[in-house]
Amino acid sequence: MLNEPVSGSISNYLTTTHHAAVIYGEGVSFYYVEPPEKESLTYLGLLVFVLLNQAWFMGALFLVAGYFTPGSYERRGAGAFLKGRLLRLGVPLIVWVFVLNPLASIGLYLEPVPRIPGSLTWEAYPHLLGLGPLWFVALLLIFDAGYAAWRMLPQQRTPTPPRPPSQPTYASIVLFILGLTLSSYLLRIIVPIGQPVNLMLPFLSFPSLAYFPQYLSFFVVGMVAYRRNWLQTMPGSMGIVGVVAAVVAFVLLFPLAFFGGLGGQFLGGGHWQSAVYALWDSIMAVGLCLGMITLFRRFLNGSGGVGQFLAQHSYMVYLIHSLVLVGLAVALRDIELANMFKFGLIVGIGVPLCFVVAAIIRRVPLVARFV
């Protein structure tokens, strides 16, 4: 079955490396960035890495979250489930928006080419509020609340026992990919990839709602997988097929989506390149998740002392990794190194440092109750 400690620590590694690549490669959408070395192999490599990560790993997080949701609800009941979600998701979210996000945003003033002119003053505080990477926590809280509301409907109040073990069919997987491709393509006509969407308040900005069909559908698939024991019964060959499909899609569809250059047609707006890109990232997401499930089940199903340590601190790592990365990037700012070397340093130092800092913070009284 899916191993929560291992999946949590690996997802944190991917999140941290993803944002480190944004700092030195993409150059636009983080708290601190350095001018990318455009027209270089470093720029191209980090850009491809960011796009590959974006295509699947947040969907994988929602899949894992969905898998563990029904069992948690049935063990605790509606009231305790919602209270637990508000404490574990809502409280850290509030602290992030009003305290930690403004601290991380100081990096905007420390960039080699600052995006915000002038000096940092208290008048800037309202403009530094935001969800940042905690958009995932906010959206997960919405999904959990929606699941609880659905379970409290009269016809859903009786606990649903797990069904006899079954496994998904290749036909159902292909239909799912096609449905995900179509819904993603249609949404991206209105909300292209990279366009933030504000909900009610300016600081409630979701940066990647273009992937909403993937996030919601993977959360639901995770719950279905729990009910039908898919993670125990899915054949290992299905994981291999998934990875092969992802590789083939990367070789054939990924370059095709950029036909005509990097002008942005692949991001959305109804262009045919956007349809190709939606098909590519749907195949990537499904294929790599199938491979991840079978890999974890076969090789990474244990949870020894190291696994328990990673599990205990993985959520705190997710909360603080942006601050750690900004601090390290600022410390390396004036050192004459190529961006790829700085990327390697910040990942090599940043990932273990995040866990050390997380372990220290969680020793503060009451903190471990929430994270």
Regions from the language model: what does each represent?
Residues 1-371:
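Alpha-helical transmembrane segments and their immediate juxtamembrane cytosolic regions
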